[in-house]
Amino acid sequence: MATGPRYFVAFRRRREGRTNYHARTRLVVATKPRMVVRKTNRHIICQIITAHMEGDRTHVAANSSELRKFGYEGSLNNTPAAYLTGMLLAVRALKAGQEGAILDIGLHRATPGARVFAALKGAVEAGFDIPHNEEILPADERCKGEHIAEYAPDRAGNLPANVAATVDAIMGELN
């Protein structure tokens, strides 16, 4: 007698490797909004998102390409850029009335000191409330770009000063 197929076809986004539904379910049922951090080959993208039945809603967003407006001259995909993008997102979220969120790194590997955690550190230092463990955050030297300036002084010798000036410009937006 026929019983049908003995296999199960996974959801399309799971088959494509784009969504971890187990992790998404845990994040969606939380009462706080999510701070979503995604890295591309050229940029870091941070968003504050809430889940609704019609679809997720983005309340605040920041892209590392916007750092040029604040005087940042370094790469838009490194650890200092992630730190500054997280800080920019937090400043915008605080101005919009958001006070906290839960970190959502998607399918990115949770390696201590990774760029997604640099964005978290920037948001926390700007005054945004996100639960986290201090051990996963990158060192201050990495967020300021001192490791890049040490490695390539001819190209990025002034990066720590540039990051500090950009932090001042971003925090000036809060006032």
Swiss-Prot record:
A Pfam cross-reference name: Ribosomal_L5e
Top-level taxon of origin: Archaea
The keyword Membrane belongs to this UniProt entry's keyword annotation: no
Disulfide bridge partners, by residue number: none
Any Gene Ontology biological process: ribosomal large subunit assembly
One Gene Ontology cellular component annotation held by this UniProt entry: cytosolic large ribosomal subunit
A GO molecular-function descriptor: structural constituent of ribosome
SUPFAM superfamilies in UniProt: Translational machinery components (SSF53137)
Record key words, sorted: Ribonucleoprotein, Ribosomal protein, RNA-binding, rRNA-binding
HAMAP family membership: Ribosomal_uL18_A
Family in the record: Belongs to the universal ribosomal protein uL18 family.
Assembly and binders: Part of the 50S ribosomal subunit. Contacts the 5S and 23S rRNAs.
Record function comment: This is one of the proteins that bind and probably mediate the attachment of the 5S RNA into the large ribosomal subunit, where it forms part of the central protuberance.
Name of this chain's protein: Large ribosomal subunit protein uL18
Organism whose genome encodes this protein: Methanospirillum hungatei JF-1 (strain ATCC 27890 / DSM 864 / NBRC 100397 / JF-1)
Lineage: Archaea, Methanobacteriati, Methanobacteriota, Stenosarchaea group, Methanomicrobia
Gene for this chain: rpl18
